[in-house]
From Swiss-Prot:
One of its GO terms (biological process) is sensory perception of chemical stimulus. Glycans are attached at residue 158. This is Vomeronasal type-1 receptor 98. The keyword Cell division does not apply. Putative pheromone receptor implicated in the regulation of social as well as reproductive behavior. The chain crosses the membrane at residues 20-40, 50-70, 93-113, 134-154, 187-207, 236-256, 269-289. It is found in: Cell membrane.
Amino acid sequence: MNKDTTMYCSAYIRDVFFCEIGVGISANSCLLLFHIFMFIRGHRPRLTDLPIGLMALIHLLMLLLAAYIAKDFFMSSGWDDITCKLFIFLHRFFRSLSVCATCMLSVFQTIILCPQSSHLAKFKPNSPYHLSCFFIFMSIFYTSISSHILIAAIATQNLTSVNLIYITKSCSFLPMSSSMQRTFSTLLAFRNAFLIGLMGLSTCYMATLLCRHKTRSQRLQNSKLSPKATPEQRAIWTLLMFMSFFLVMSTFDSIISYSRTIFQGNPSLYCAQILVAHSYAVVSPMLVLSNENRLTNPLISMYERIVRLDFLCW
C-alpha cells in the first residue's frame, strides 16, 4: 500500500469530502423530514412518497456511516478485521439499497403513469406489494455479489505493504487473483447493466406514453397545450434527471473501480472514487426537493408576499 495515498487525500480531498457529506446529510434529512411532516399533517400521500422517503433514509444512513468511516482516512482508529469487514460491508450494503431503491422508483413511476390499456395496468392495485418484493429480491441479489468483501477486507498491519489495496488507514483489500478478478468484474458488469437497463427501459416507456398523450390531446383539442407542465411531465423530467445523473455517476464509479485494480496505489484514482461514490446520494434529494410543488409553491408564495410587503413599505 502506498503511503502517499493517505497524504494526498488528506491534503486535497478532506475538506471537499466532508463538505459533500455534510450537504448530503442535510439534504436527505430535509427530504425525509418533509415527508414525515406531510404524513403527520394528514396530507394524502402520493404513491411515490414511500419509495422517495425510503431512498432518503437509505442515503442518510449511508452518508452517516461514510462520515464515520472517513475519520479513518486521516487518523487511524485501530480497527481489527471484524470491524473493517463490518463497516465496509455495511457501506456497500447501503449503496446496494440506494441503487435498488432508485430502480424501484423508476419502475413504480412507470406503473403509475401507464394507461389502463397497457399490460402493466394489472399491477396497479398491488404495485406496492409487488415492488416491495422486487426491492427485497434485488437488494439480496445486488448485495450477494459484493459478499467477497467479507473475505477481502482486512485490518492493515503493515503500512509499507505494496500488495494491499488501500481503503482507510486501518483497513485494506487483499488482492484477488486474475481469475477471481475477471469473475467478479463480469458479475458486477451484469448487475449494473441489468439495473441500469431496467431503469432506462422504464424511463423510455414513460417518455413514449407522455409523447403519445400530448399528440392525442393536441389532435382532440386542435390547439396547443398549455405551456405549464403537468404533474406527469414534471414526474418524467425528475426521473429523467435521476436516470441521467445516476447513469453518469455509475459509469464513472465503474471505470474508476476497474482502473484501481490495474493501477494499484494511485492516489488520484482513489480520491476521485471517494467523491464520485457519494455524489448521487448528495444530489438526488436536491433534485426531488426542487421539483416538489408541495414545498416550492409555499416558499414561492411566501417570497412573493415578502417582496410585496417590502414594496408597500418602501
